[in-house]
């Protein structure tokens, strides 16, 4: 399996990362001010989806989870000071890198090549057009737009045992 991953990574890893960055830059997302809660809201929405909870329209479920999370952090910062330090750029970037690392592990444990899976996801995301509303991308669901949608084929990423 290691050899298989090395071959695949050498062929596509730069392309996959570039496609993920392109999604952000084409839509001007990289120009928005950084807001940790907005970023965490996106991650929470995906975590809920992984558990079967759909929260696509108004993000209310994600907001409830984020509010609970923030209440916990506030409690720790006030009453458990030994376990809290003010976040820095370094700790935030480190945390996001760790999230990517754990997500990569999850994809591998499910039996998929993360590079190919991410490539498929990038193709799907970049095939969509739409608008942003409240910080969330809303797909154009017109017949013309749907005709251009690519559906990720994760079977291409399935690892051979």
Give residue spans per PLM region:
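Flexible "arm" and connector segments at domain edges
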Residues: 1-96, 100-161
């Amino acid at each position: 399996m290691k050899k298989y991953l090395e071959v695949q990574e050498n062929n596509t890893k730069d392309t996959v990362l570039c496609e993920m960055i392109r999604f952000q830059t084409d839509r001007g997302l990289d120009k928005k001010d950084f807001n940790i809660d907005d970023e965490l809201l996106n991650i929470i929405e995906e975590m809920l989806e992984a558990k079967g909870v759909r929260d696509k329209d108004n993000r209310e479920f994600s907001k409830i989870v984020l509010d609970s999370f923030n209440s916990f952090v506030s409690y720790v910062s006030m009453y458990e000071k030994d376990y809290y330090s003010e976040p820095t750029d370094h700790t935030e970037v480190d945390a996001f890198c760790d999230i990517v690392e754990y997500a990569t592990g999850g994809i591998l444990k499910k039996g998929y090549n993360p590079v190919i899976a991410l490539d498929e996801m990038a193709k799907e995301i970049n095939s969509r057009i739409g608008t942003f509303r409240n910080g969330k991308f809303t797909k154009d669901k017109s017949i013309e737009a749907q005709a251009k949608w690519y559906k990720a084929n994760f079977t291409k990423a399935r690892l051979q045992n």
